[in-house]
């Protein structure tokens, strides 16, 4: 079977340079969207190491645009663990503490799960909130989704060989058997990921090198979840550091301030 197009691959000499470039891209994408006909910017964030990276770089990158621009941002989360917001595993909780305290997006435009609901109801509730925020879209269309990828090839809470990879109707799905703790989560589904205008995968460190080679170069009969993210009309980009990219033989753009 033919391999899908890997998208634009950018490799940075360090995770610090990657983070700075990512923040600038978010700021530029926001400015472009806010200047357009819709005059809003919809951003979907993932957790993990992205929290500290964006917390370090994004406030300064978007500061020149001023708080009036942030008032037109809509922020959602690509997946979430079903834990209280003050729990160390809460993606929203970590962003609230480390980023949103310095990025004054109106609270009404930050779309979160209700962690007090059972996981199935939490997924339905989050889907309802997304549909309200994206009125006019048959499926929520994010201007920019920032995704991570696990050493096993998972992205969001979409894990290898899991039935959720076949989900085509729901925009948000519950998962109660995550192979990575905590087991109960809520995740965007592939139809939403592939409807986005721009998707950026971010991966750093040698621990990601082998799986990135599989995703970006191998022609697998049973593709890993991250390889199934192929935006229908949007752009797909990969931001990697040198350690994560060390096994790649496909063409990529090398970025360095040296």
Swiss-Prot record:
EC number: 3.1.1.31
Catalytic activity: 6-phospho-D-glucono-1,5-lactone + H2O = 6-phospho-D-gluconate + H(+)
Compartments (UniProt record): Cytoplasm
Residue(s) carrying N6-acetyllysine: 180
GO BP: carbohydrate metabolic process; pentose-phosphate shunt; pentose-phosphate shunt, oxidative branch
Gene Ontology CC annotation, any one: cytosol
Source species, domain of life: Eukaryota
Record PTM N-acetylalanine, positions in chain: 2
Family note: Belongs to the glucosamine/galactosamine-6-phosphate isomerase family. 6-phosphogluconolactonase subfamily.
Function: Hydrolysis of 6-phosphogluconolactone to 6-phosphogluconate.
Full protein name: 6-phosphogluconolactonase
């Amino acid at each position: 079977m033919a391999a899908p197009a890997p998208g634009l691959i950018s490799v940075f000499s360090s995770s610090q340079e990657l983070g700075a470039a990512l923040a600038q891209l978010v700021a530029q994408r926001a400015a472009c969207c806010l200047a357009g006909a819709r005059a809003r910017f919809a951003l979907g964030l993932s957790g993990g190491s992205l929290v500290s990276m964006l917390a370090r770089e994004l406030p300064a990158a978007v500061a020149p645009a001023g708080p009036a621009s942030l008032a037109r941002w809509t922020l959602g989360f690509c997946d979430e663990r079903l834990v209280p917001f003050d729990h160390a595993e809460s993606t929203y909780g970590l962003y609230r503490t480390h980023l949103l305290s310095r990025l004054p997006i109106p609270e009404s435009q930050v779309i979160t799960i209700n962690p007090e609901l059972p996981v199935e109801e939490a997924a339905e509730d989050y889907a309802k909130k997304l549909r309200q925020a994206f009125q006019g879209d048959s499926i929520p269309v994010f201007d920019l989704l920032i995704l991570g990828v696990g050493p096993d090839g998972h992205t969001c809470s979409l894990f290898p060989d899991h039935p959720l990879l076949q989900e085509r109707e729901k925009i948000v799905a519950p998962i109660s058997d995550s192979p990575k703790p905590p087991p109960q989560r809520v995740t965007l589904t592939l139809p939403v990921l592939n409807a986005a205008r721009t998707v950026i995968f971010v991966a750093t460190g040698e621990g990601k090198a082998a799986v990135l080679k599989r995703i970006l170069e191998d022609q697998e009969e049973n593709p890993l979840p991250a390889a199934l993210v192929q935006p229908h009309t949007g752009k797909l980009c990969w931001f990697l550091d040198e350690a994560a990219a060390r096994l790649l033989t496909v063409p990529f753009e090398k970025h360095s301030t040296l």
